[in-house]
């Protein structure tokens, strides 16, 4: 499975990557992981990926724009939105 991780916080990128590598060792899943530190570097590439972990708030191109781009390349992609901003959590809880 191809997995993309995009976050401007490199600690978060490493934590997600380590989690996936550990999961890969404990199961039959084999992850091919590609990491980016900003959305700008993704928009000019034709990356087809099965799963993506994307920070919603990054300098330059934000996570929503990256998600839309990746969905044009693979409409079946599964995207996990990552954020450390409390405001986004508050907004999402309103809709539960």
What residue ranges belong to the model's regions?
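Active-site residues of response regulator receiver
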Residues: 7, 55-56
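Two-component/phosphorelay signaling modules centered on CheY-like receiver
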Residues: 9-34
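Acidic, metal-coordinating helix/loop segments flanking the phosphotransfer/catalytic sites
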Residues: 32-51
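Acidic catalytic/metal-coordinating carboxylates
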Residues: 38, 62-65
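A short, hydrophobic beta-strand element within the central beta-sheet of small alpha/beta folds
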Residues: 55, 76-86
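The feature encodes the CheY-like receiver
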Residues: 59
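Short amphipathic alpha-helix used as the core "switch/output" element in two-component signaling
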Residues: 64-75
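Conserved small/polar residues in nucleotide/adenosyl-binding loops
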Residues: 94-96
